[in-house]
Structures are given as structure tokens and as C-alpha cells.
């Protein structure tokens, strides 16, 4: 689709689930997008710096969202020493 200036404009940009890498459909009303702020040495949030995670309704309905969020945050270096059942 084009706007009045002739630029291509997409009406819908699909997201992918951060945990399963599946595309989140437009009618998945149980999906969430979570922003986790990066913090400095004093534990204060750094303005404008965050990591975004999208979790599908499938992951949430299976009760795996908390473990998936912990795993993703550990892989990105945001969490340390979190106990996991899978280890």
C-alpha cells in the first residue's frame, strides 16, 4: 500500500514469538510484548535502552511464559543465577 507521497506503507507487520520463533497471528489476542529495561551499576533504568520480548498466546497458555522469559533474559545477559528446572 502507498501513501499520498508514494512511499510504501505496511498496515500490519507480523511479530515472531521470542521463545518459539513462530509468527504471531493478528488474531492472537493472548500474546504479549514485554519491554525489559537495561540498568546501570546502581540499579537504575537507563532511559531509552530496553530489550523487547514477544510471547505468543500458545506459550502463555502452556504456562511456559515465565521460564521462557527467564531463559531469554539470561541469554541476553540481563539475569544471572536463575534456577531452571531444565538444568
Curated annotation (Swiss-Prot):
Transmembrane segments: none annotated. GO terms for cellular component: cytosol; cytosolic small ribosomal subunit. The modification N-acetylmethionine is found at residue 1. Disruption phenotype: Reduction in growth rate, a decrease in free 40S subunits, an increase in the amount of free 60S subunits and a decrease in polysome size. Keywords: Acetylation, Cytoplasm, Ribonucleoprotein, Ribosomal protein, rRNA processing. Present with 27400 molecules/cell in log phase SD medium. There are 2 genes for eS21 in yeast. Belongs to the eukaryotic ribosomal protein eS21 family. Component of the small ribosomal subunit (SSU). Mature yeast ribosomes consist of a small (40S) and a large (60S) subunit. The 40S small subunit contains 1 molecule of ribosomal RNA (18S rRNA) and 33 different proteins (encoded by 57 genes). The large 60S subunit contains 3 rRNA molecules (25S, 5.8S and 5S rRNA) and 46 different proteins (encoded by 81 genes). PANTHER family: 40S RIBOSOMAL PROTEIN S21. Component of the ribosome, a large ribonucleoprotein complex responsible for the synthesis of proteins in the cell. The small ribosomal subunit (SSU) binds messenger RNAs (mRNAs) and translates the encoded message by selecting cognate aminoacyl-transfer RNA (tRNA) molecules. The large subunit (LSU) contains the ribosomal catalytic site termed the peptidyl transferase center (PTC), which catalyzes the formation of peptide bonds, thereby polymerizing the amino acids delivered by tRNAs into a polypeptide chain. This is Small ribosomal subunit protein eS21A. It comes from Saccharomyces cerevisiae (strain ATCC 204508 / S288c). The lineage of its organism: Eukaryota, Fungi, Dikarya, Ascomycota, Saccharomycotina.
Amino acid at each position: 500500500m502507498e501513501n499520498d507521497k508514494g512511499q510504501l506503507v505496511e498496515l500490519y507487520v507480523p511479530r515472531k514469538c521470542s521463545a518459539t520463533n513462530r509468527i504471531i497471528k493478528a488474531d492472537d489476542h493472548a500474546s504479549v510484548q514485554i519491554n525489559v529495561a537495561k540498568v546501570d551499576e546502581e540499579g537504575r533504568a537507563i532511559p531509552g535502552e530496553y530489550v523487547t520480548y514477544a510471547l505468543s498466546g500458545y506459550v502463555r497458555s502452556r504456562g511456559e511464559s515465565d521460564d521462557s522469559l527467564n531463559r531469554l533474559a539470561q541469554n541476553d545477559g540481563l539475569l544471572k543465577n536463575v534456577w531452571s528446572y531444565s538444568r
